[in-house]
Amino acid sequence: MNRLLFLFVCLISIASFGQNTYQIAILKYNGGGDWYANPTALPNLISFSNENIGTNIKKEPATVEVGSSDIFNYPFLHMTGHGNVVLNSSETENLRNYLLAGGFLHIDDNYGMDPYVRTEIKKVFPEIDLVELPTNHPIFHGKYEFKNGLPKIHKHDASPSQAFGIVIDGRLVLLYTYESDIGDGWEDAEVHNDSEQIRLKALQMGANILEYVFTN
């Protein structure tokens, strides 16, 4: 799919939220990090969102390599892991073009990814800094209200959960969730033995993210 057509499809999806069927994807990257972490997370978020906020997303997410032109087939990419991330120059250019053409990337640090992914984000957008999203950002006030911003799902340490973004011409093109482990909260209940309340909070915040992406 060429970039102009991709942008057109994104605009159609936004205009007909809940009417078109579309697919989102997990981003596969190099460097040794476990891009495949949390295998039940995205399917559970998709089911929750389809049932509760009116999305019409295909039940199973795709998997797409960061350097592939196939990323232009998906309006939303999800990236996670615990370790190293390395993007070569062609992958960096491909991801940059995707985001500039209307795509969206959500990166969730699964604890241990932070120093690596920040370096790679800077390679994609050397001229733009990650900015912390304030608690009054619309992404926290969609279908579900999070007046204190990004919820803390797993407490590995005492650091607060934070949401960072890359904003271009007023559009949030990349969301980086840090010290939250929100993706763990999307997983099947028995994976981490999270309480129903914690899982619901994670899924509701995830639904807000999808709602924001497809309606803004």
List each model region and its residues.
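Alpha-helical scaffolding within the catalytic cores
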Residues: 59-66, 83, 88-93, 158-162
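Short alpha-beta junction capping motif
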Residues: 24, 76-115
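Aromatic-Pro/Gly-enriched surface loop or interdomain linker
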Residues: 18-76, 80-83, 173, 179-182, ...
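Surface-exposed patches in mature extracellular/periplasmic domains of secreted proteins
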Residues: 56-64, 107-110, 128-135
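Sec-dependent N-terminal signal peptides
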Residues: 4-15
